[in-house]
Swiss-Prot record:
Source organism phylogeny: Viruses, Riboviria, Orthornavirae, Duplornaviricota, Resentoviricetes
Top-rank taxon, per record: Viruses
Keywords associated with the record: ATP-binding, Capsid protein, GTP-binding, Methyltransferase, mRNA capping, mRNA processing, Multifunctional enzyme, Nucleotide-binding, Outer capsid protein, S-adenosyl-L-methionine, Transferase, Virion
Predominant place of localization: virion
Protein purpose: Outer capsid protein involved in mRNA capping. Catalyzes the last 3 enzymatic activities for formation of the 5' cap structure on the viral plus-strand transcripts, namely the RNA guanylyltransferase, RNA-7N- and RNA-2'O-methyltransferase activities.
Cellular localisation: Virion
Protein's name according to its UniProt entry: Outer capsid protein VP1
Reaction catalysis annotation: a 5'-end diphospho-ribonucleoside in mRNA + GTP + H(+) = a 5'-end (5'-triphosphoguanosine)-ribonucleoside in mRNA + diphosphate; a 5'-end (5'-triphosphoguanosine)-ribonucleoside in mRNA + S-adenosyl-L-methionine = a 5'-end (N(7)-methyl 5'-triphosphoguanosine)-ribonucleoside in mRNA + S-adenosyl-L-homocysteine
Keyword hit for GTP-binding: yes
Family stated for the protein in its record: Belongs to the aquareoviridae outer capsid VP1 protein family.
Species assigned in the record: Aquareovirus A (isolate Chum salmon/Japan/CSRV/1981)
Transmembrane segments: none
Length: 1297
């Protein structure tokens, strides 16, 4: 692709190949044309006809009307279309009559008309001039084809502007366009006429031979430029002598000659783009050639550029943009402006006055025309047509690619600063979308292990500072629009509906519960009540039964009662009280006042709750002062307490869920509460800090913030593929300052000049890459130059419309853990990156002074020549090749999302592949390894659509089958590592729920859905990173840690004056220094062993997870690795009584249950994949004689209802224990004793058949019961609301209906 004088040409050549010969018209055909009825004329065509108004402003003329050069009084620019039609129809009929008087039609019908003469006759007649002088020349002699020779045999004067002199016929050029009254040449959308609507725009000089032609040239030597069509000129050879001056609507420098040259050039480009061998054309070379008075070597002249570019058009060159059939004034003006822009001059073909050189490779067929001469040689074009791509409404993204060239950084920056766009108008859509990141924790506490309330964490120190408030407000504005109260209410109430009463394991919220909503307001969009109200009434909140009534109370209530929720209300009690009262409504930012209000609202909400019911209270600021009052005043008011946090924006507000309203509860402060609050406040701080990167709303981007846009604009840029131009330097520096994957190009037409804007996001990582660059890589511009489409204007949209997918969130979270937490404090200098990827993102992530060696099987897309070769190396190869490890010394290694694919490709399972890989690198003296491994670290459950765990084959199936990789258990992986590195310290890294990784999401200009956060954290637990540290002594865990079991951990330390710190999921859970040992994961005692120089920690863990341990030695953190705290064995054994000892009455049976005491157990049924509690009168886990037993009652529905004994952990049912009660399901019922019968599982009914006949329907029971059937006072049905009947002995068949 070439740019000639600012006009982009494709690398294809194409021309028409078949010429249409001159078709002479018969006399009768002319008469017919002249007498055509109004509206069906063959003499003209309206180019802009409006079918609604029947109007037009411009007409295209056809022979012989196109020979008319109107006298001033007959120019039709004051006529409408209808007036024109009427006038021309009348005049042409009159002309036909006059002609037939001189030459009767019958006698002359078949004679061929001289096309020049009939044109002159038409022009004179319409101008009301005599036509007698032309009539003798009307017809051509038989078999004569030359229309010129008969007219120029002798000198003659036909009129004052048409005459023959020295065998040359001079006559005004006819108008090819007629403009009517509504034509406005100053409007950009008007069709361009190239001046051919102006009378006397040019004089046509027809000549019969070369001698006569020379006469013309000599006559006008030194005058205006003379132009000529070389290829099959209309009716015969002629020279055009353009008039001087500029037509109205055009720039003053555009005279008639230049306009005619432009018309011919555009016509030629249009023909080249559409021509094919199946279509004949009147003229293949549509261009005009300047044959006298030109300046072919002065490339500053527009006419010279037009003439030289025309030479390329003759060869078959095509523009990259399509030429309209009838270009507008704007189109032509833009073309001429681009033509005068920068670009290479036309030097491929020499200009000759009387000839045109034709390339050997050109498809142009010149036949016997002596004006065209074949020129041998090679040219950078190929034969073919160009496919034109339509314009786009939006800018185009492009991926930067680079040449093997660089430019000086300072020079590139200088060029860039001349074209940079300052003060960009940033458009900031939403950084946060989706619903909420919801967390809930049981903080009921153990009276035997009370956490001191006064040591609970307070709010972040600068929470109320102007800067923190500004950042929280900014994030709130960048949250997608939704009714935030509704989102919170749905999460909170959905969770509350699943909570079980700790006394009987029954769901508290059953069908028909009553509810009070405190803080209800009428400020929810189009509705005058909280949106959750209607959703609850209609039953559309998942899992929540429909309440019998909902009462609303608050300051701004519309469908309830106005009430102050801090004062005792004159109301009854409710099963469920939900308070969304904001304490800041009255207290503002006064912590003391808000604490007082929160305690008061809690007191009122609990007082309105029925015994055994639920209470949810919002607390804006959960400070130690609030917790002190809560546990002092309400410790006995419920049997369990949960803390809920639906994260929607950055706030520290929480919701407290009081379970089973009571007067004898025992709520105490718990370690779980402290952990939750630490995590809550850490998350708030992280989300606040990340907003430091984001520019404020309502202001332009001045480049002050690390996140924003960089843009430069080039006008008709010269972007060669080989040379270095200032524009190339500008683009190179632009790409060096932004994230490559965010690059966009916008091409706009600015009155003919093409404005090309390059823009993309800058981030703190792009700045890191720029600092690492020694020179600036030169971009490859082939793809950019190929873009001929115009686009919409640049849109500086800071955050994308679609949130980052889970896998991208995970990568960004990994980046945070590695590049901001682990690596900087280790001060490592030489890195080897396995499977880095061709985009070389690591160069942006690592500090500029760090040496990086990258290995990947694919070639790099990054230009490594622009970086210091001593510190940045890229190896195309296989990192499983032993030769790579001998040649590349390093002290640190990473393999992120690389090993699984490599082992899968080699057909190895993970343990075998990992062992081989570690032995492979062992001789390289590596000190640190970060390996992403597929292992079920935090869960064994699949993630639908993301990771399917195939336990049979030991494979992870990613993204629905797109990729399959091996996985292994964590213990097997650690055993393989110890086999190669017995003294290695190993630490597992997963994404933290403190969301400290959002700096690499929002801070990099990505948006995220809060719905995906939980999924991403689970994903990271299935694909964690293992840090292998060969420089530190690992902690020793002689016996694996298990929840509830006391164990010892040995932690080496250089001296006693150190502190051991333990963390889980990014939250510190204990510190131990020999004096104090506060711990939220269970009782902890610590002793210093001076002989072995280690700390001996005795701990009884109270929660499962990955425990990370470090030693703080004078501010230097010494890694001691990770260890897993497992849940107790989830084995359960139930011993049922012998068949002979079964009791089929409602007295029930007892089966001994053996299971670890850690697990709280209950009996459930599975309904549509979800566990639901069983009526405790039917089956329940009870404690008798300090042992747990399953107490159950036999029922004829047992053969159709499979019950399960499940654990209830953190309000999750069946996560660890889900034992089907097959013994009960397979019961054989006797036929000689009364039996109990109830409906089966929910939403189904039962029917008893006896001897093949209906005995009784169980739901509903009939009004009249069969003999011997008795309704039981106490229901033992699966659902307690349904009835149980006792039936007499018999051989019943139970049917589910």
């Amino acid at each position: 692709m070439a740019t000639v004088y600012g006009i982009q040409l494709t690398n294809r050549l194409n021309t028409a190949t078949v010429r249409r010969p001159l078709r002479l018209r018969r006399y009768d055909s002319c008469i017919t044309t002249f007498t055509t009825p109004n509206g069906i004329s063959q003499l003209y065509r309206a180019l802009d006809f409006q079918p609604t108004s029947f109007q037009a402003s411009i007409l295209q003329t056809f022979p012989p009307l196109n020979a008319w050069s109107p006298s001033p009084q007959f120019v039709p620019d004051d006529l409408s279309l209808s007036q024109w039609k009427e006038w021309i129809t009348e005049r042409m009929r009159a002309l036909a009559t006059v002609l037939q008087r001189a030459h009767p039609l019958v006698a002359n019908a078949g004679r061929e008309v001289n096309p020049i003469t009939i044109g002159l006759i038409t022009s004179s007649f319409l101008n009301q001039r005599p036509i007698d002088g032309y009539l003798p020349f009307l017809f051509l002699a038989r078999n004569a084809r030359d229309p010129i020779a008969p007219l120029v045999t002798v000198d003659i004067t036909f009129s004052d502007d048409t005459y023959v002199s020295r065998h040359v016929l001079y006559t005004p050029a006819g108008l090819k366009y007629l403009t009517l009254s509504s034509y406005d040449p100053t409007k950009p959308s008007s069709i361009c006429t190239f001046g051919k609507h102006i009378p006397l725009y040019a004089t046509a000089a027809f000549y019969p031979d070369e001698t006569a032609r020379l006469t013309i040239l000599h006559r006008y030597n030194g005058g205006p430029p003379l132009i000529e069509h070389f290829d099959q000129p209309t009716y015969g050879p002629h020279v055009l002598i353009p008039a001087l001056g500029s037509p109205e609507g055009y720039d003053t420098h555009l005279n008639i000659c230049r306009l005619l040259l432009a018309e011919g050039l555009l016509d030629s480009f249009r023909l080249n783009a559409s021509a094919g061998p199946s279509t004949a054309v009147a003229r293949i070379d549509q261009t005009y050639h300047v044959v006298m008075n030109g300046s072919p070597d002065d490339h500053t002249q527009l006419a010279t550029r037009l003439s030289n570019l025309s030479l390329l058009a003759v060869q078959g060159c095509q523009m990259t943009v399509q030429v309209a059939d009838h270009p507008t004034m704007s189109d032509v003006g833009g073309f001429l402006v681009r033509l005068q822009g920068p670009g290479d001059p036309q030097r491929l073909i020499a200009y000759r006055t009387d000839q045109i050189l034709i390339w050997q490779a050109s498809p142009f067929p010149f036949g016997n025309n002596a004006r065209y001469v074949r020129r041998p040689g090679r040219v950078p074009f190929t034969i073919g047509t160009t496919t034109y791509v339509p314009d786009t409404k939006t800018p185009l993204p492009f991926l930067p690619q680079y040449r093997q060239a660089t430019v000086n950084k300072n020079n590139a920056q200088d060029s860039y600063e001349l074209n940079v766009l300052p003060s960009l108008p940033i458009y900031s859509p939403f950084a946060l979308t989706g619903g909420a990141f919801f967390q809930a924790r049981d903080i009921t506490g153990d009276p035997a292990n009370v956490w001191p309330v006064n040591t609970l964490p307070g709010l972040p120190r600068d929470y109320f500072s102007i800067q923190s408030r500004q950042r929280r407000e900014l994030l709130s504005r960048l949250r997608s629009h939704s009714d935030r109260s509704y989102v919170k209410d749905v999460h909170n109430i959905s969770f509350a509906s699943t909570v079980l009463n700790p006394v009987n394991n029954q769901i508290v919220l059953s069908e028909g519960f009553s509810m009070a909503y405190l803080g209800a307001a009428s400020t929810h969009g189009t509705t005058d009540e909280p949106l959750i109200i209607e959703a609850l009434k209609s039953g559309t909140v998942p899992g929540v039964p429909i309440p019998s009534k909902i009462s609303q109370f608050g300051y701004d209530v519309a469908n309830g009662s106005i009430m102050d929720a801090t004062l005792a209300p004159p109301t009854g009690t409710f099963t469920f009280v939900y308070s969304d009262v904001d304490q800041v409504e009255d207290a503002g930012l006064s912590i003391v006042a808000t604490n007082r209000a929160a305690v008061a609202v809690t007191n009122i909400a609990l007082s309105m709750t029925t015994a055994g019911g639920l209470t949810v209270v919002k607390v804006n600021f959960p400070t130690p002062a609030f917790w002190t009052q809560l546990f002092r005043n309400h410790a006995t008011d419920a049997r369990a307490l949960y803390i809920l946090k639906p994260l929607i924006v950055n706030s520290v507000e929480v919701f407290l869920l009081f379970v089973s309203r009571a007067t004898a509860g025992n709520l105490v402060s718990s370690p779980a509460l402290r952990q939750f609050l630490v995590q809550l406040f850490d998350r708030s701080t992280s989300l606040s800090e990340v907003m430091a990167h984001v520019p404020l709303l309502g202001d332009v981007d001045t480049g002050v913030t690390t996140l924003g846009f960089n843009a430069c604009r080039l006008y008709s840029p010269d972007l060669p593929t080989v040379n270095i131009t200032p524009e190339i330097q500008t683009l190179a520096y632009q790409l060096a300052t932004i994230v490559p994957s965010t690059s966009f190009i916008a091409r706009e037409d600015y009155d003919g000049a093409t404005a090309v804007t390059f823009y993309g996001k800058r981030t703190f990582l792009s700045r890191n890459r720029l600092d690492r660059l020694v020179d600036v890589p030169v971009p490859a511009t082939n793809a950019i130059n190929h873009q001929t489409r115009f686009t919409g204007s640049p849109v500086y949209q800071l955050f994308p419309t679609n949130p980052a997918p889970v896998t991208q969130l995970l990568w960004l979270a990994r980046t945070t853990g590695l590049y901001t937490a682990s690596w900087p404090r280790l001060l490592l200098s030489r890195w080897l990156i396995c499977g880095t990827g061709p985009e070389c993102r690591i160069l942006s992530l690592m500090p500029p002074a760090t040496s990086v060696t990258m290995i990947d099987s694919r070639p790099p897309a990054e230009s490594l020549a622009a970086f210091n070769p001593a510190m940045n190396q890229y190896i195309v190869g296989n990192f499983l090749d032993p030769a790579q490890w001998v040649a590349n010394p390093h002290d640190s290694l990473t393999a992120i999302f690389s090993l699984g694919a490599a082992f899968a490709g080699a057909g190895q399972d993970l343990v075998v592949g990992l062992t081989a890989f570690l032995r492979l690198i062992q001789p390289s003296n590596v000190q640190h390894l970060w390996l992403q491994l597929n292992t079920t670290l935090t869960s064994t459950a699949s993630l639908p659509g993301l990771i399917e765990i195939d336990t049979r084959t030991g494979q992870y199936i990613f993204n629905g089958g797109q990729r399959t990789e091996p996985y292994a258990a964590p213990d097997a992986i650690l055993a393989a590592i110890r086999l190669v590195y017995p003294a290695a310290t190993t630490s597992w890294l997963t994404a933290s729920s403190t969301m400290d990784w959002t700096e690499y999401v929002i801070g990099l200009g990505s948006s995220m859905s809060l719905d995906d956060v939980s999924t991403m954290i689970s994903y990271s637990g299935l694909t964690p990173i293992l840090h292998i540290d060969l420089t530190q002594r690992p902690m020793d865990v002689p016996v694996p840690l298990v929840v509830g079991v006391q164990a010892v951990i040995h932690v080496a330390a250089p001296v006693q004056q150190t502190t051991v710190i333990g963390s889980m999921a990014g939250v510190q859970v204990f510190t131990a220094d020999g004096v104090n040992a506060p711990s939220t994961i269970g009782p902890l005692a610590v002793v210093w062993d001076p002989v072995l120089s280690r700390w001996d920690l005795t701990i009884t863990p109270n929660q499962p997870g990955v425990l990370d341990v470090v030693v703080d030695h004078n501010g230097v953190l010494l890694n001691r690795g990770s260890t897993t705290i497992a849940l107790p064995p989830a084995t359960i054994v139930i011993t049922f009584p012998q068949a002979a000892n079964r009791d089929f009455t409602n007295a029930g049976n007892d089966a001994a249950v053996v299971c670890d005491a850690f697990y709280r157990l209950g009996v459930f049924v599975s309904v549509n994949g979800a566990f639901q509690p069983v009526n405790p009168e039917r089956a329940a886990i009870v404690t008798a004689a300090n042992a747990r037993v399953l107490h159950y009652v036999y029922d004829l529905s047992d053969n159709h209802v499979l019950m399960y004994v499940c654990d209830i952990t953190d309000n999750n049912i069946g996560r660890n224990v889900a034992l089907p009660l097959a013994d009960i399901f397979q019961t054989l019922f006797p036929n000689n004793t009364p039996l109990l019968a109830s409906p089966p599982y929910p939403s189904a009914s039962g029917r008893l058949m006896l001897n093949g006949q209906l005995f009784v329907d169980l739901d509903p029971l009939p009004p009249v019961l069969p003999p011997g059937v008795q309704i039981q006072a106490l229901s033992t049905a699966i659902e307690p609301a349904r009835q149980t009947a006792e039936v007499p002995g018999g051989a019943y068949t139970y049917v589910v209906v």
